[in-house]
């Protein structure tokens, strides 16, 4: 069985960026239906089909979205009749993700979880706690088909798209971890969600936009997060960017640009051969105009590749007078890559030139590098490569999730200004 990328302009070759068909082998049938995949009316129909009053679905939804109760914590669901809990939870909260490994660093303020889906696909999410907010970086695909050579995820290829519920589950888990004080810093509240984990979000357009609506909607419909705390990244799938502008979702759009010229960007971001810099930025400005939201321009600083002052000038020229902010990311190391992050002096020079040209610029305060949880490092690597392991239980014994068992600077992470 094959499946194609969910591009609104039709399938494209994510590895070369050329307009040909992209196929991948699915490991199994679609993930089980989960309440996060369903509208409120659809959930109520499920309850009625089980011989229960429709409002039982609302009760289950409130436990999940508002109380953040695990489906295996049936004793906490005292408003559900005991004989109805099993059928309702089996139908509305099936097992989707099982934690295969959990790693932490930054004095316990950063936690990466590797998840295994029911069909064996692997994905990762990262929770990061800052003094003024808590952010979760979620995956939208298992793997990635965009083929960017400096990104570990892209080098592993694409396994499949994630379902809406598989995306939402990563967020609900993060909210639960913070509420239950399982992360350093005491009890907290999830404030930001960034679609910057594994995968190209806009290549899984339908599931990602549905997940955004679930995250924004109030309980029992959804999690009730602020749309302004949500960020969707893209390497530049132009038709999907334009489509997103019309969705009525005032989320932040982050464009992974990495080069101001087509010659270099063709090498760094292969999809650029399909949609070059001018088209990507035109779609970004359209998004900013329609939504009123400032676009974040993501730019990985690679030593001797894209960090010269001439390219800073070229970037400033492209962004002059636009509703945009540049988020510079010192390249994070990935296995097999000879590229390195720009030296601090080079970073400062790049920032200085952009700021001299009037461009709002920050440098990401990278989190999670030592556990391969930083930007471009997510690859669901084997547990043996990890440096510090909090939990490395076998998948079979790990507690499943959902089982009847940004701020100034980068919206994704903390930022610092180099002076």
UniProtKB/Swiss-Prot annotation:
Catalysed reaction, written as an equation: adenosine(2503) in 23S rRNA + 2 reduced [2Fe-2S]-[ferredoxin] + 2 S-adenosyl-L-methionine = 2-methyladenosine(2503) in 23S rRNA + 5'-deoxyadenosine + L-methionine + 2 oxidized [2Fe-2S]-[ferredoxin] + S-adenosyl-L-homocysteine; adenosine(37) in tRNA + 2 reduced [2Fe-2S]-[ferredoxin] + 2 S-adenosyl-L-methionine = 2-methyladenosine(37) in tRNA + 5'-deoxyadenosine + L-methionine + 2 oxidized [2Fe-2S]-[ferredoxin] + S-adenosyl-L-homocysteine
GO biological process: rRNA base methylation; tRNA methylation
SS bond partners: 137-375
Co-factor requirement: [4Fe-4S] cluster
Recorded GO MF terms: 4 iron, 4 sulfur cluster binding; metal ion binding; rRNA (adenine(2503)-C2-)-methyltransferase activity; rRNA binding; tRNA (adenine(37)-C2)-methyltransferase activity; tRNA binding
Name of the protein: Probable dual-specificity RNA methyltransferase RlmN
Active site: 124 (proton acceptor), 375 (s-methylcysteine intermediate)
Positions bound to S-adenosyl-L-methionine: 199-200, 233, 256-258, 332
Keywords: 4Fe-4S, Cytoplasm, Disulfide bond, Iron, Iron-sulfur, Metal-binding, Methyltransferase, rRNA processing, S-adenosyl-L-methionine, Transferase, tRNA processing
Record-linked PANTHER family: 23S RRNA METHYLTRANSFERASE, RADICAL SAM CORE DOMAIN-CONTAINING PROTEIN
Keyword Ubl conjugation: no
EC number: 2.1.1.192
Pfam families: Radical_SAM
Species annotation: Frankia alni (strain DSM 45986 / CECT 9034 / ACN14a)
UniProt family annotation: Belongs to the radical SAM superfamily. RlmN family.
């Amino acid at each position: 069985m094959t499946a194609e990328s969910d591009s609104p302009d039709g399938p494209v070759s994510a590895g070369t960026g050329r307009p040909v068909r992209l196929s991948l082998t699915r490991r199994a049938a679609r993930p089980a239906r989960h309440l996060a995949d369903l509208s409120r009316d659809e959930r109520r129909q499920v309850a009625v089909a089980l011989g229960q009053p429709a409002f039982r679905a609302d009760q289950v939804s409130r436990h999940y979205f508002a109380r953040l109760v695990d489906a295996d914590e049936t004793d906490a669901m005292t408003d559900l009749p005991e004989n109805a809990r099993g059928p309702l939870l089996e139908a509305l909260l099936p097992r989707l993700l099982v934690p295969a490994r959990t790693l932490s660093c930054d004095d316990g303020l950063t936690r990466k979880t590797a998840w295994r889906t029911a069909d064996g696909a692997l994905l990762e999410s990262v929770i990061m706690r800052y003094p003024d907010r808590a952010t979760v970086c979620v995956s939208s695909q298992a793997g990635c088909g965009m083929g960017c050579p400096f990104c570990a995820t892209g080098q592993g290829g694409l396994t499949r798209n994630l379902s809406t519920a598989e995306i939402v589950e990563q967020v609900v888990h993060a909210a639960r971890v913070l509420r239950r004080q399982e992360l350093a810093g005491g009890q907290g509240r999830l404030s930001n969600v960034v679609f910057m984990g594994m995968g190209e979000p806009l290549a899984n357009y339908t599931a990602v936009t549905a997940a955004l609506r679930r995250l924004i909607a109030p309980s029992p419909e959804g999690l009730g997060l602020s749309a302004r705390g949500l960020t969707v990244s893209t390497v530049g799938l132009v038709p999907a960017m334009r489509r997103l502008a019309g969705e009525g979702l005032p989320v932040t759009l982050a464009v992974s640009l990495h080069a101001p010229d087509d010659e270099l960007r063709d090498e760094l971001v292969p999809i650029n051969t399909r949609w070059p810099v001018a088209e990507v930025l035109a779609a970004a400005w359209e998004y900013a105009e329609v939504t009123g939201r400032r676009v974040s321009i993501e730019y990985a600083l690679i030593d001797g590749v894209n960090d010269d002052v001439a390219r800073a000038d070229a970037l400033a020229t492209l962004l002059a007078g636009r509703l945009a902010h540049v988020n510079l990311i010192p390249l994070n190391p990935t296995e097999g890559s000879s590229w390195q992050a720009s030296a601090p002096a080079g970073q400062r020079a790049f920032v200085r030139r952009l700021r001299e040209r009037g461009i709002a610029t920050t440098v990401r305060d990278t989190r999670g590098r030592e556990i391969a949880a930083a930007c471009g490092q997510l690859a669901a690597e084997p547990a043996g490569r990890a440096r510090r392991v909090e939990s490395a239980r076998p998948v079979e014994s790990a507690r499943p999730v959902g089982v009847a068992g940004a701020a100034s600077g980068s919206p994704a992470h903390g930022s610092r200004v180099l002076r």
